[in-house]
Design a protein with these regions (language model features):
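Contiguous hydrophobic segments
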Residues: 20-21, 57-74, 117-124, 170-195, ...
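A contiguous, well-structured "functional interface" segment within a domain
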Residues: 25-59, 222-224, 233-294
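Extended repeat-based interaction scaffolds and adjacent low-complexity, acidic/S/T/P-biased segments
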Residues: 252-254, 258-451
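Generic structural hydrophobic/aromatic packing signal, biased to beta-strands
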Residues: 19, 77, 104, 131, ...
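Extracellular polysaccharide-recognition and catalytic grooves
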Residues: 2-189
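Terminal, non-catalytic domain-edge segments
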Residues: 107-114, 123-130, 134-274, 417-424, ...
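A residue-identity detector for tryptophan
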Residues: 28, 41, 50, 90, ...
């Protein structure tokens, strides 16, 4: 405007209203029809810079709204990053990678003494190193299309080799002057320094229905959200349809033979393994994050899903309903091969068998309490974003009618000698209708779930 260019004010205001209407609170915009990092590297980034450079002068009311939404980021979004600052592999366009931390850097625009700018910069610098220090990051001196290295399952049809440079949005932090608190604060670990070991911490975004969980024992962050049908079919892919996403365990793609990690797959009427794609939020109560889901090709195959984050993993209490027999599989997170072959073992504690895999960095263990017929170690090739070879623990069963599946999905650092980590539960009780459950944990806590 200052240069004499004409602006269609009515059209501009219409677009601004559409953007603001997508806001769901706690820093999250809805990238219709799904939540993902576009809330951060698009809505929040553009909203704050537009307000700063243009909106405050010409559209102050809209700028005020964008900046009010932007101010909510430090209260929630930093918790989505691991203790060491790593980001979670989640959502479309993940090849933009470190661009996810740009709004944390731009909180410097607020110059708010209550913001821990050392934590914001710690995350920003750590996400840069997360990728620049990975040996597979570059190919022909250009960042690969993937997460760490090239990884086709994570790529959308609109992406090309040049798409990766969206990650450069993080360097918009250089817009901040040298005397800005973002540049002058001492980097630190933020809230992680206050977290206690053997506890779990959850941040719930009530209107967005996003649950972020932090695990001090291994320094991991984790995310749960919902999905819905989209004409673009984004909801069909692993970027969105995992049960949860973890900073330490990037998602593994599904295999044609039923290989599955952190999701359910069902053999459909065509004889193909079909993952869950539609997750509808039900409630977050007494620590349980509850959703319902259904098979897209046959909505009569219906799931009630409940997850309770624990200090060293997840307790799942799920109910599956199907009018006819169906084969069902569900997996833990997968481990990439990092230090030689992945070690496999079976540990028996308190009458329960725990299948354990160990890649020299982490151990993952899965215990079936109820419902499952068997567990197995499943080897995969070229399904994991961080290694050609990987292993996952899968459980399987043939379900008809209504059936409850209770599963512990646990973890620890490799080298730990404490096998008690594999059984944090004393007992689980439920009524005849299997609609009410009481979980007694070994730390004395009691949790209740009611469907």
């Amino acid at each position: 405007l200052s240069q004499g260019y004409h602006t269609d004010k009515a059209y501009l205001e219409e677009l601004l209203q559409i953007l603001l209407a997508a806001y769901r609170g706690d820093g999250w915009y809805h990238d219709n029809p799904l939540f993902d990092y576009y809330s951060m590297w698009a809505f929040q980034m553009y909203g704050s810079l537009w307000s700063e450079k243009f909106g405050k002068k010409y559209y102050p009311d809209y700028a005020r709204q964008f900046m009010e939404h932007f101010r909510e980021i430090p209260e929630n979004y930093p918790y989505m990053f691991a203790r060491d600052g790593k980001m979670i592999m989640w959502g479309r366009s993940i090849t933009y990678r470190m661009g996810a931390s740009v709004p944390l850097a731009l909180t410097g625009l607020l110059e708010d003494p209550d913001i821990n700018y050392g934590w914001m910069r710690r995350i920003a610098s750590s996400t840069i190193l997360q990728f620049l220090q990975h040996p597979d990051f570059l190919e022909d001196r250009i960042p690969t299309l993937g997460f760490y290295g090239a990884f086709e399952p994570a790529i959308q049809g609109y992406s090309c080799r040049g798409s990766v440079f969206w990650m450069g949005k993080l360097f918009l932090a250089l817009y901040l002057p040298a005397n800005n608190p973002f540049w002058n604060a001492v980097e630190n670990e933020g809230a992680w320094t206050d977290f206690e070991k053997d506890r779990v911490y959850c941040k719930y975004a009530e209107d967005a229905h996003i649950l972020v969980t932090d695990y001090p024992n291994i320094g991991a962050s984790e995310l749960r959200s919902t999905t819905s049908h989209s004409s673009s079919n984004y909801h069909c892919v692993e970027n969105y349809n995992r049960l949860s996403y973890n900073s330490e365990f990037p998602w593994q793609a599904d295999g044609k033979n039923g290989e599955v990690a952190m999701s359910y797959v069902v053999k459909n009427k065509e004889g193909k393994w079909e993952p869950l794609r539609n997750y509808s939020f039900k409630k977050y109560e007494d620590g349980f994050y509850c959703r319902e889901a259904w098979l897209e090709s046959d909505e009569a195959v219906y799931f009630q899903l409940a997850e309770l984050p624990l200090p060293d993993g997840i307790l799942r209490i799920d109910k599956v309903s199907s009018p006819s027999p169906v084969e069902v599989r569900m997996g833990h997170y997968a481990l990439p091969e990092k230090q030689g072959k992945i070690r496999e073992s079976v540990i028996r504690l308190d009458g329960k068998e725990t299948y354990v895999i160990d890649n020299g960095v982490y151990r993952l263990g899965m215990t079936t309490w109820e419902g499952w017929k068997q567990m197995e170690f499943v080897h995969a090739e070229e399904l994991h974003p961080d290694s050609r070879n990987s292993v996952v623990i899968d459980a399987s069963d043939r379900c008809e009618g209504e059936k409850v599946y209770i599963t512990l999905q646990l973890w620890s650092k490799s080298g730990s000698k404490d096998d008690d980590v594999w059984n944090p539960v004393s007992k689980i009780c439920f009524d005849k209708s299997r609609k009410q459950f009481e979980v007694v944990l070994k730390d004395g806590n009691v949790k209740r779930l009611k469907w």
